Amino acid sequence: MADAWDIKSLKTKRNTLREKLEKRKKERIEILSDIQEDLTNPKKELVEADLEVQKEVLQALSSCSLALPIVSTQVVEKIAGSSLEMVNFILGKLANQGAIVIRNVTIGTEAGCEIISVQPKELKEILEDTNDTCQQKEEEAKRKLEVDDVDQPQEKTIKLESTVARKESTSLDAPDDIMMLLSMPSTREKQSKQVGEEILELLTKPTAKERSVAEKFKSHGGAQVMEFCSHGTKVECLKAQQATAEMAAKKKQERRDEKELRPDVDAGENVTGKVPKTESAAEDGEIIAEVINNCEAESQESTDGSDTCSSETTDKCTKLHFKKIIQAHTDESLGDCSFLNTCFHMATCKYVHYEVDTLPHINTNKPTDVKTKLSLKRSVDSSCTLYPPQWIQCDLRFLDMTVLGKFAVVMADPPWDIHMELPYGTMSDDEMRALGVPALQDDGLIFLWVTGRAMELGRDCLKLWGYERVDELIWVKTNQLQRIIRTGRTGHWLNHGKEHCLVGMKGNPTNLNRGLDCDVIVAEVRATSHKPDEIYGIIERLSPGTRKIELFGRPHNIQPNWITLGNQLDGIRLVDPELITQFQKRYPDGNCMSPASANAASINGIQK
């Protein structure tokens, strides 16, 4: 029996020792688990922050208003609570997945990247995946909160749940790490990507021809255009500045008065309102603190606003102003003349007229720098020869236009027979149709100015001359004060404030620069039938360095590289040697103003 009891006591001792060892193991595991939780918590926060930032980055890249290329610093500015390193890491991850194409650049002193192109479909898929992961994490957090709210008497269940959650988190993090390693590009992929980026950089650089074309259309000597002031005269501009200064000072004074009154009101409320020392008192204290902070912010804003207003009002207006022309017979109470500088009776008109108020402090004799000197020396094309203005005084009804050769662009402002008194003669519809315009072009463009009832006649003439109407320009007329004309001299039922220019095409013209200009010209009205000078710039940009001719031109229409024809020009001036020889053969006496001279020239040509 003694042996049996000894065996039993040994077994109990062993069991107690095993229990003690198990308890010690559990204590060690618990201590280690607490340490691991403390270490893993910041990592989880970083992962969650990365997911949120990645979601915002994907939303910013998939937006329709994104302008490419864009630098990573600009993406950081759009996303609150993000750093440049985090955004660069996310962009590199997206580039490895093939959603975007980036290029490494240096932004100031920091290294960054530039987004060149975006794949919308892949970005959409990645955004959906990130949204799903965010939703899963939110659901897990809700479940944990629900579990924490329930009172659990046993500590073992809490420890088991924490261990399970740790295992799940580690099991979730493990495949992410594996996917990260798999998505990392290899050295071969990096080399091929670098080669592709270098090729793309070479392709995006402008060529020498593109740079020369851009240099060609720059203004000689830089931009010399001044903006008109919206207030009109200098007096009105100063009045407006004083009014804004007074308003700013008034607002500043009102804010100061409110700031002085608010402390008294708050003190009175504290004396009369006896609040017990409870949570409500703390809330009132918080509200009072917020009110004081708001007052300080408003006072700071008012000081800033007053400084800006004072700086704005003290600055002089650098825009262009007008000056009233006050004569002995002018009556200012009548107001402005509706025709302004186009008034035919300015010497006796009692209404107010204007002239540009020149600025005496502007130095017109500025030394030209090297860039402007180089821009003045540039030419258009070595292959084409440019000539100074050329013109022929002639009657277009009788001129033999085959002598002139072929042109790339034709512009015509015909004297249409409209029901209106004009300072020049007009042509009938049949005479317009019989003009020799088809001989001027085989392939090219025509710009035909039309007005009133001549719009339909102009379309008929284009068809008859062999053109197809492809576009239309509109000239919106403004007066001297840069306002839209409301009392025009044309129009039977409504005052016309615009004119139309039909654009026709013949054949298949080449070397046209499409899409450079708009089809609307907003320009000031000058003399009768004086078209805006902007049309010449539009035509030159559309077809640079080519032969151009203008029909029914006047002395103010002569332009370099243009031949102008009209009966109001001063004689004949030709520079092109080929054109001179052809014209002298056809018109030896140089007279092409009458049908008799044209017939005599044709008879002489037949006899020779």
From Swiss-Prot:
Q: In which tissues is it expressed?
A: Expressed in testes. In the ovaries, detected in germaria, prefollicle, follicle and polar cells (at protein levels). Detected in the ooplasm and in the cells of the 16-cell cyst of early stages (at protein levels).
* Pfam family of the protein (one): MT-A70
Q: What is known of its domains?
A: Gate loop 1 and gate loop 2 regions are adjacent to the S-adenosyl-L-homocysteine-binding site and display large conformational changes upon ligand-binding. They may play an important role in adenosine recognition. The interface loop contributes to the heterodimer interaction.
Q: Does the keyword Nucleus apply?
A: yes
Renumbered to this chain, region (Disordered) spans: 250-272
What is this protein identified as?
N(6)-adenosine-methyltransferase MT-A70-like protein
Keywords, sorted A to Z: Differentiation, Methyltransferase, mRNA processing, mRNA splicing, Nucleus, RNA-binding, S-adenosyl-L-methionine, Sexual differentiation, Transferase
The entry's S-adenosyl-L-methionine-binding residues are D395, L396, D413, K531, R554, P555, H556, N557, N567, Q568
Q: Where is this region: Gate loop 1?
A: 414-428
Annotated family: Belongs to the MT-A70-like family.
Database matches in PANTHER family? N6-ADENOSINE-METHYLTRANSFERASE, N6-ADENOSINE-METHYLTRANSFERASE CATALYTIC SUBUNIT
Report the top EC class in one word: transferase
A GO term, aspect molecular function:
mRNA m(6)A methyltransferase activity
